[in-house]
């Protein structure tokens, strides 16, 4: 059996073939324009400035991004390479650019003649070849396609009678344009006609510039004996009279007879013969309808027309000029009013936005911690002033995976690792007490004072406090800190499984710790670190020092204060150490960093006893950690010299941390910015906590 004819399938095949054909033609068109430009590039043999550097053959599909090329709908409409000092010849293939409207190649070093193909441009409107080394004869067809103002050829070496004649015509055109510009600057009294088809005119003080775009010349007649225009020249007024020839007069009269039969508003010609009318040349812009309103209409010049001549028609002229002038004045007034209205509305909207932003951030501001629900004394309430946000237990429980990820357990509290929804890691310290009755008022006051103290510290080399959590059912007291993922300094110095620290890393840790202690001691009032040891120095990914503080300091063993009167026994509160104690601890810490020995061990005893013999005899090389392959002797001497001053037994003789930083900085060239972590997750953690709190 034969196959049955399926007209629908045949039509669909034809339709797909048509689409493929159109797409291929479109791509060929795009490729052809790119290759045309490359042919022009091939004829350029000198490009001193590298103007055509991005005209690559491999990138011919993106020719619209080439220098000097302007496209519309992937079609080249303008090629502007003026002043590029290009040398070579003109490519006749440029005429294949079907949408090219402007070709500007002036102020180059192009030679040869103009190709005859340039006369076959489809839509070329402007050609500028000035100031080149072109020669030969200009194609005559090119003079017919483009007018003198749109074909610029001066500054070349063309030959031929037609070329010279065209260049002279172009020069005359420039001279005429210059004269028109001079006339545009001279104010004059011109004649405003009532009707374009009539010659009856009235005096009007204005002058329409001759060189305005789309202007043309009108011959205006009147029945008076003279046509006069008063002009200002060097501060003087004079009258110009123009006397037409007999031929012009006869032509004008025949035109007048024709107009009288076809114009209802035309006035009859005078019975008595009058002298031949005088003609002047005035420029008016092209428009439809009556002439536009002219300014200064009220300042009229006395009529120069004799009484014997017919009077002008002032009524129609007033109708033609005064209402538009008044409309322009009203329009200007309305524009000013609208301008003030728009400015006022914009200012009002801006004020609303500012108020809304302030209200939004005040609403999301950090919540202050309120007094303890069981009741606190006035001194306890005053001691608790902070600005860190309060968090919910459920949020921290989710971040810490039900508090299953334990970093380290201490005497009295446990530290958990958590991850916020944004991926930022945090450390959560939670007290070991699980019942309210076991949490004394002294513990509560110590807890709140700890939050108040740490919330005042905001340094890049400090484990900053970013939140807290307190609930009574179920009972919990927690603090949220930054997380330093690279362990502690103690682990890197004494645990062989941890990554080894070279000399530069150790000096950077020393400087970062010193900068942080100086910042804490210079606060008002000063803040001292509770227990400055190597296990309290945490390291970031780039081995920057982050000084960590003991979150729950009730178990630090500090000496108690003297009892004070009140409802709370102040002797239970630990006394924070003095800044001089931190200076002493920093001296011990520096010896531990450079030697790699424990600060205090049962086998070797105190590090001070071990290091004293080297410090007294200036035998500093034997103090260096054996695992260090290289070190800087000048920096070692500076560290040991500062350590001697920090370890003085008399607290009054110990230097301030500011002096310590200055002495170290003179030798160790590590600034405060270089000692800080390159990437700190603190701000991301705060942002995440604030956003979750607002929702």
Curated annotation (Swiss-Prot):
**Pro residues bias: start-end ranges:** 303-314
UniProt cross-references to Gene3D superfamilies, sorted A to Z = Phosphorylase Kinase, domain 1, Ribonuclease Inhibitor, Transferase(Phosphotransferase) domain 1
The segments labelled Disordered in the record are 302-325
Q: Where are the LRR repeats?
A: 75-98, 99-121, 123-144, 147-168
Glycan attachment positions: 56, 80, 247, 316
Parts of the chain on the Extracellular side: 30-340
Q: Give the record's membrane topology.
A: Single-pass type I membrane protein
PROSITE patterns this protein is in? PROTEIN_KINASE_DOM
Q: Which Pfam families match?
A: LRR_8 (PF13855), LRRNT_2 (PF08263), PK_Tyr_Ser-Thr (PF07714)
In the UniProt record for this chain, what is stated about the effect of gene disruption? Decreased micropylar guidance and fertilization efficiency.
Q: Which family does it belong to?
A: Belongs to the protein kinase superfamily. Ser/Thr protein kinase family.
What's the protein called, per UniProt? Protein MALE DISCOVERER 1
**Organism lineage:** Eukaryota, Viridiplantae, Streptophyta, Embryophyta, Tracheophyta
């Amino acid at each position: 059996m034969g196959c049955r004819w399926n007209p629908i399938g045949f039509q669909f095949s034809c339709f797909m073939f048509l689409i493929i054909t159109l797409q291929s033609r479109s791509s060929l068109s795009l490729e052809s324009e790119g290759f045309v430009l490359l042919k022009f590039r091939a004829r350029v043999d000198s490009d001193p400035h590298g103007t055509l550097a991005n005209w690559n053959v491999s990138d011919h599909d993106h020719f619209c991004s080439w220098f000097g090329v302007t496209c519309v709908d992937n079609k080249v409409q303008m090629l502007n390479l003026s002043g590029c000092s290009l040398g070579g010849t003109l490519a006749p293939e440029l005429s294949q650019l079907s949408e090219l409207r402007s070709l500007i190649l002036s102020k180059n070093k192009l030679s040869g003649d103009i190709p005859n193909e340039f006369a076959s441009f489809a839509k070329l409107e402007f050609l500028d070849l000035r100031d080149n080394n072109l020669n030969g004869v200009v194609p005559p067809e090119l003079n017919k396609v483009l007018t003198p103002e749109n074909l610029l050829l001066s500054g070349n070496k063309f030959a031929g009678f037609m070329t010279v004649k065209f260049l002279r015509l172009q020069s005359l055109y420039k001279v005429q344009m210059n004269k028109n510009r001079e006339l545009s600057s001279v104010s004059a009294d011109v004649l405003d006609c009532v009707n374009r088809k009539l010659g009856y005119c009235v005096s009007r003080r204005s002058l329409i510039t001759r060189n305005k775009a789309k202007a043309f010349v009108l011959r205006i007649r009147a029945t008076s004996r003279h046509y006069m225009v008063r002009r200002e020249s060097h501060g003087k007024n004079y009258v110009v009279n123009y006397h037409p020839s007999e031929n012009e007069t006869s032509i004008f009269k025949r035109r007048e007879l024709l107009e009288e039969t076809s114009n209802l508003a035309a006035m009859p010609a005078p019975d008595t013969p009058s002298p031949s009318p005088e003609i002047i040349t005035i420029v008016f812009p092209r428009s439809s309808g009556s002439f536009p309103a002219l300014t200064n209409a009220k300042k009229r010049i006395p009529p120069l027309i004799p009484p014997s001549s017919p009077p002008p028609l002032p009524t129609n002229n007033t109708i033609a000029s005064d209402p538009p002038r008044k409309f322009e004045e009203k329009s200007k007034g309305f524009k000013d009013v609208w301008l003030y209205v728009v400015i006022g509305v914009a200012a009002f909207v801006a004020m609303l936005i500012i108020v809304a932003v302030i209200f939004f951030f005040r609403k999301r501001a950090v919540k202050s911690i309120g007094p303890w629900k069981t009741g606190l004394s006035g001194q306890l309430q005053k001691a608790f002033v902070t600005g860190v946000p309060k968090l919910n237990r459920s949020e921290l429980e989710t971040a810490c995976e039900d508090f299953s990820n334990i970093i380290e357990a201490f005497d009295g509290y446990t530290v958990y690792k958590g991850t916020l929804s944004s991926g930022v890691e945090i450390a959560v310290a939670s007290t070991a007490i699980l019942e309210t009755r076991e949490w004394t008022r002294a513990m509560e006051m110590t807890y709140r004072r700890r939050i108040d103290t740490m919330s005042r510290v905001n340094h890049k080399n400090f484990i900053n406090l970013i939140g807290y959590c307190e609930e009574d059912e179920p009972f919990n007291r927690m603090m949220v800190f930054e997380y330093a993922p690279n362990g502690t300094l103690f682990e890197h110095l004494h645990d062989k499984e941890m990554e080894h620290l070279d000399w530069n890393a150790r000096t950077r840790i020393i400087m970062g710790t010193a900068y942080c202690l100086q910042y804490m001691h210079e606060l008002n009032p000063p803040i001292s670190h509770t227990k400055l040891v190597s296990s309290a120095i945490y390291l970031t990914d780039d081995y920057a020092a982050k000084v960590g503080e003991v979150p729950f300091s009730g178990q630090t063993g500090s000496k108690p204060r003297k009892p004070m009167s009140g409802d709370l026994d102040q002797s239970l509160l630990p006394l924070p150490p003095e800044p001089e104690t931190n200076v002493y601890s920093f001296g011990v810490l520096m010896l531990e960093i450079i030697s790699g020995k424990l600060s205090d061990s049962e086998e070797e005893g105190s590090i001070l006893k071990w290091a004293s013999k080297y410090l007294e005899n200036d035998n500093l090389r034997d103090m260096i950690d054996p695992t260090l392959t290289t070190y800087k002797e000048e920096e070692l001497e500076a560290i040991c010299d500062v350590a001697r001053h920090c370890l003085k037994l008399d607290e009054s003789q110990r230097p301030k941390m500011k002096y310590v930083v200055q002495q170290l900085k003179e030798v160790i060239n590590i600034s405060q910015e270089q000692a800080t972590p390159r990437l700190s997750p603190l701000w991301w953690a705060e942002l995440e906590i604030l956003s979750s709190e607002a929702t």
